Amino acid sequence: MKNEMNIQFTALSQNESFARVTVAAFIAQLDPTMDELTEIKTVVSEAVTNAIIHGYENSGQGNVYISVTLEDHIVYLTIRDEGVGIPNLEEARQPLFTTKPELERSGMGFTIMENFMDDISIDSSPEMGTTIHLTKHLSKSKALCN
């Protein structure tokens, strides 16, 4: 059975934990393993932080949009902003690349997303924002119920 959730919140750093916990609570109905749940929470944290820090340049202006679809033990996750966009997506996806070294950003956000999820695609246009589509196939172990 297909199940969907959509949330929208102001692009403030303090809302990152709300996004992470909300997505994790929704996904918990599929009984993911602790590792799977931790990986998804980490990916949500990275993508939302990117939207807030880079997309909206930590201005507190704008919204972050998250949609989650669950179907047949597959998690489809979309995280979107309407911020400044990514001028060079190929460069941004390189490990350790950051546009904010003064904020001590590691430049590993996209690398983490790519390693923790089964599929990732990124659409971004200058001054139009960024949309990240992520997919994760969950095991069917019912690990959290045992």
Curated annotation (Swiss-Prot):
PANTHER family per the UniProt record, alphabetical: ANTI-SIGMA-F FACTOR RSBW (PTHR35526:SF3), ANTI-SIGMA-F FACTOR RSBW-RELATED (PTHR35526)
Protein known as: Anti-sigma F factor
Job of this protein: Binds to sigma F and blocks its ability to form an RNA polymerase holoenzyme (E-sigma F). Phosphorylates SpoIIAA on a serine residue. This phosphorylation may enable SpoIIAA to act as an anti-anti-sigma factor that counteracts SpoIIAB and thus releases sigma F from inhibition.
Family: Belongs to the anti-sigma-factor family.
Enzyme type, top EC level: transferase
The encoding gene: spoIIAB
The enzyme's E.C. designation: 2.7.11.1
Keyword terms, alphabetized: ATP-binding, Kinase, Nucleotide-binding, Serine/threonine-protein kinase, Sporulation, Transferase
Protein origin, superkingdom: Bacteria
Gene Ontology molecular function terms on file: ATP binding; protein serine kinase activity; protein serine/threonine kinase activity; sigma factor antagonist activity
Record carries keyword Nucleotide-binding: yes
One of the GO biological process terms: sporulation resulting in formation of a cellular spore
Reactions performed catalytically: L-seryl-[protein] + ATP = O-phospho-L-seryl-[protein] + ADP + H(+); L-threonyl-[protein] + ATP = O-phospho-L-threonyl-[protein] + ADP + H(+)
InterPro entries assigned to the protein according to its UniProt record, in alphabetical order: Anti-sigma-factor_SerPK, Anti-sigma_F, HATPase_C_sf
